Amino acid sequence: DYNREDLAAEKIVRELKKYKVLERTDIIAFSINACLAFKKLMPDGRIFYLNGDLAPRSIKKLGLTGIDYSMSVLRKNPKWVEQAHKEGLEVNVWTVDTEEDMRYFIDLGVDYITTDYPERLQARLK
C-alpha cells in the first residue's frame, strides 16, 4: 500500500541524502505508517514513534529505535521506560518544562528529555 506517508518519507530521505545528513538524523513521527515507511527506506536509521499508543514490545517488533512519548503517556505507563530498555529501545519524553517533572523523568531513567528550558534541565543534571 503506497500512500502519502510513503511519498513524504521518500522525499525527506532524498533531501537528507542530498545534504549528506541522513546518518546524523533521527526520524520522529506520530504515524506508525510513516515510521514503517522510513524503516523501509533506511533500515539502519534511528526512528522513534511519537503517538504513545503502543507498548515497547510492539515498537521492538516493528524494528524501530525507540519511543518518544509525551509526559502524560509515560506518567500513565511508567513501567514502559524499563520495558523499553529491556527490549533495547531508547526512550525520549516531551515536553518537560518544570523542575519537578524533570526530576521525575530523570529518576525514571529516560534517555532523552525534550524541553523548552534546557538551562533548567542542565542544572538538574549537575
Where are the regions a protein language model picked out?
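Short loop-to-alpha-helix "cap/lid" segments that border enzyme active sites
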Residues: D1-K126
